[in-house]
Amino acid sequence: MSSKLLTIQLLEELVHAAELNQEGKTADYIPELANVNQELTAIAVQTLGEKTLAYSNNPLHPVTLQSTGKMIPLIGLLEEFGADQLFEWVKVEPSGDDFASITRLEQFGPKPSNPMLNAGAIALCSRIPGVGEQQFRWLEHWVQKLFNQRLSINPLVFASEKRTGNRNRALAYLLKSRNNLGADVHETLDLYFALCSYEAMLDQMLYLPTLLANSGKDSDTGEQILSMETCKITLAIMATCGLYDETGTHMVKTGMPAKSGVSGYTIAVVPGKAGIVVLSPRVNAKGNSIRGEIMLEGLSKAMNWHFALP
């Protein structure tokens, strides 16, 4: 099967094909997320050793990470504590339930099923070393490392998350009642809400998936930023759990490990080849970007980037 050349024209075609789909809507249960332009559709690709290519149908602005930010405590704690310790705090099994499921935690706890669920990310946030400001500095350190620059927290989104985050509070208290929360509920949730409220431009999102595609090495400098072991584990978790109870469908169609967020960002990885980020805030009931998935599937087919292809 021959693959196309990766060009701006191809990315433009992918965006225009995705624009034809009018399904989904912005995630209005976090009020600030409802204010974004729901027609925004964009893609950026960094192939290893090549220049970044990007295309957007509208002017770009910073968008919050939401659940793509769950990669930060996962990778940071893997690097600092190792897999054996991390798997004492959270399992790595696909859940088959929605990202904020309380039933799943109650039935199969006390460990959350995986780090990509809200319960899993909250459990990991409670294990961030230090107290108070030390924990926020830890987050800042790992944001700097995984995005190769500092990111800002959107204060309106942070306030919105805190004001409407009752289900996440319920998850945190349930974890606490099962002795699987390593810190105070309120302090842990502040870290979790901050994590979701970091905001980044499209090109800023591209560093992390490219880092994972390159076995943890900075593609420009060759510096080893993350261990190969951490990259291997992270990609396996993305491939099995990255889009919640739609991960199987995603992997069948694209063959790319990925992580989605309700803001519309999805990052995807083609190991040894490329890092990808797509953006469209029209999300489905499972919290995944509908147009984002259309673009990833089209890109995978055009470039023969499905992991199962020889």
UniProtKB/Swiss-Prot annotation:
| A Pfam family hit | Glutaminase
Q: Which InterPro entries match?
A: Beta-lactam/transpept-like, Glutaminase
Q: Does the keyword Protein biosynthesis apply?
A: no
Q: Which reaction does it catalyse?
A: L-glutamine + H2O = L-glutamate + NH4(+)
Q: Which GO terms describe its molecular function?
A: glutaminase activity
So what EC number does this one have?
3.5.1.2
Annotated substrate binding sites = S67, N118, E161, N168, Y192, Y244, V262
List the keywords (alphabetical). Answer: Hydrolase
- What highest taxon heads this organism's lineage? Bacteria
- What processes in GO biological process is this protein linked to? glutamate biosynthetic process; glutamine catabolic process
The UniProt subunit note reads as follows:
Homotetramer.
Cited HAMAP family: Glutaminase (MF_00313)
Family affiliation: Belongs to the glutaminase family.
What is the official name of this protein in its record?
Glutaminase
Gene that this sequence comes from? glsA
